[in-house]
UniProtKB/Swiss-Prot annotation:
It comes from Petrotoga mobilis (strain DSM 10674 / SJ95). GO terms for cellular component: cytosol. PROSITE patterns: G_ENGB. GTP binds at residues 30-37, 56-60, 74-77, 141-144, 173-175. The keyword GTP-binding applies. GO terms for biological process: division septum assembly. Necessary for normal cell division and for the maintenance of normal septation. This is Probable GTP-binding protein EngB.
Amino acid sequence: MKVYKAQLIKTVYKIEDLPPPDKKEIAFAGRSNVGKSSFLNAILGIKIAKVSSTPGKTRSINYYLVNDKYYFVDLPGYGFASVSKQEKERWNVLMNEYFKTRFSLSAVSLLIDHRHMPQKLDYAMVEWLKDLGTPFLFILTKSDKLTKSEKAKLFEDIKRSFSTYGEYIYMPFSSKTKEGLKEVLKTIGEILGDND
C-alpha cells in the first residue's frame, strides 16, 4: 500500500461523534510513550500526528482519512498514571464502546516498545481484543535503539510471551531509520484489501 494523501479529519471525545462507518479502518493502540505519534507520522509520510515528550498526550480518538478511502485511527495511549480517575474512566468507556460498535474496524495494530517486555496492560488489551473477536497484529517500535542481537532476542521473547493467545504477525519498526516501513504498509494494505 502507498500513502499518497492523509489528513486529520476528526478528533473524537464522545462515541456519538465518530464519523459514519462507511470506510474500512485500522486502529493503532499502545501504551503511552510507545512512539505511536512518531509511528503514524512515519507511515503517513507527513508530520500529521503531534509528537510529544509527555506520555499520554493523545486523549481523543483521532481519525485520519488516507487516500480518500480508508481511516487510520489513533487511539488514546493506555497506562499513563498521572491522569485523573475520572479521565481514565472516560477513556475506558470510549474505548469499550469503540471496539464493541465499530463494525468497519478491520484490525488493530498493537504497538509495543521493542526494548522492553510487554506489561500487564498490554496483555489485558490482547485478552480484550481476543474476547471481542477483533483481529490484531503487533508492531515493535523503537527497534533502532537495540543492537542486532538484543533485537533478535527481545523479538523472540516478546513473541513467546504472547504465544498462549495464538499466532500473530510481529513487525519490528523504527520511525527514525524507517526499518519495517515497507513491511508495515504492505501488511496494512493486505488487511484493508488495498493492492497499491
